[in-house]
Amino acid sequence: MTQVPNRETPRGVAILTRFLASESAGGIVLMAAALAALIVANSPLSAGYFSTLHSVWLGLSVELWINDGLMAIFFLMVGLEIKREVLAGGLATWGQRALPGFAALGGMLVPALIYIAINWGNPQTLSGWAIPAATDIAFALGVLSLLGNRVPTSLKVFLAALAILDDLGAVTIIAFFYSSGLNLPMLAAAFVTLAVLVALNRLNIRRLLPYLLLGALLWFFVLQSGVHATLAGVALALCIPMGKPEEEARSPLLLLEEKMHYWVAFAVVPIFGFANAGVSLSGITLANLIDPVPLGVALGLFVGKQIGVFLAAVLAIRAGLAVLPEGSNWVQLYGVAILCGIGFTMSLFIGNLAFPGSQHLIDEVKVGVLIGSGLAAVAGIVLLRSRFSRH
């Protein structure tokens, strides 16, 4: 396969470097937030923890403000990353997209099939099929960072690109499968607002303020429309102008991405993790762990992800459609495939959408996500550490 040109600009390279660093550190903060949530939820503080999440402010519970509001900012960040990578970064050509693209597709398909197989015949739990289909980029890069600079940058970029494409798949799934009860007037208002945002982009309006104000309005209309409000963040991101490479110093997209990265990595995602990882383990027995939902989620993440990602990558490389990341080998690629089973943030998020109003099933999702992601993190780091220690 021919070598693809590197179209990343110097500032784009700097942003990628900071991105990997902040996501890795943010992943460690997210781990701490998740652990803190588990401790608090199983301590005398649990009553205050859960009552705070369910308390209402301005018509929405604190939990919904986090899941529908703060996570819209997270999805705005995801959208900016996707647009930057596709236009001028590590996904700028079809050759660069090939390996993470095939791997992401396999990594979404196989976990979903495993979950469906385990929950077949149960319409209530079958709606959670997409829960194990996503990779948590912050958590996965955070675990990978524990190996330090022994990990080739190409592997980190592969994992980041795969997770970004995973997020794109998750956004598509949410839009088509987890939006219901549409309010057509509000949906029409959302489309009109989006059309104005597109017009601003076409008119080459480069000031961020008009986009952000209209983005807030778009979020409100989407929230009221029945489509999940976080999709407003992605739609806004796609309207923010990127500009030409020679204009990168004035690129609104790069400027907004730079300003948002640390807030998202060290505030938004950890707050989400703390609010959603808390589950009381007092009523959970070993028998509950093999209930269809936690079993399907855990096996989908731990088994399905590594099989789907690695098998799709192998087939793509063997067929000459992609190449191994530079400086890596098959075992290292397999180790990264295992780490793709860390599905924390997006898996918990989709779990809330799949089982609205069913706290029991949401708690089972949390248990499955924690077990599957934990096993993937431990197995992946053990394999990669043993492999890198030989070099």
Swiss-Prot record:
GO cellular component terms given for this protein: plasma membrane
Membrane topology: Multi-pass membrane protein
InterPro entries: Na/H_antiporter_dom_sf (IPR023171), NhaA (IPR004670)
GO terms (BP aspect): regulation of pH
Keywords: Antiport, Cell inner membrane, Cell membrane, Ion transport, Membrane, Sodium, Sodium transport, Transmembrane, Transmembrane helix, Transport
Domain of life the protein comes from: Bacteria
GO molecular function, one term: sodium:proton antiporter activity
TM helices/strands, residue ranges: 25-45, 56-76, 98-118, 128-148, 157-177, 180-200, 208-228, 264-284, 297-317, 335-355, 364-384
Record Pfam families: Na_H_antiport_1 (PF06965)
Keyword Protease: no
Subcellular location: Cell inner membrane
Primary site of residence: membrane
Keyword Acetylation: no
Family that this chain belongs to: Belongs to the NhaA Na(+)/H(+) (TC 2.A.33) antiporter family.
Physiological role: Na(+)/H(+) antiporter that extrudes sodium in exchange for external protons.
PANTHER family xref list: NA(+)_H(+) ANTIPORTER NHAA, SODIUM ION/PROTON ANTIPORTER NHAA-RELATED
NCBIfam families linked to this entry: NhaA (TIGR00773), PRK09560.1 (NF007111), PRK09561.1 (NF007112)
Protein name: Na(+)/H(+) antiporter NhaA 2
Taxonomic source organism: Pseudomonas syringae pv. tomato (strain ATCC BAA-871 / DC3000)
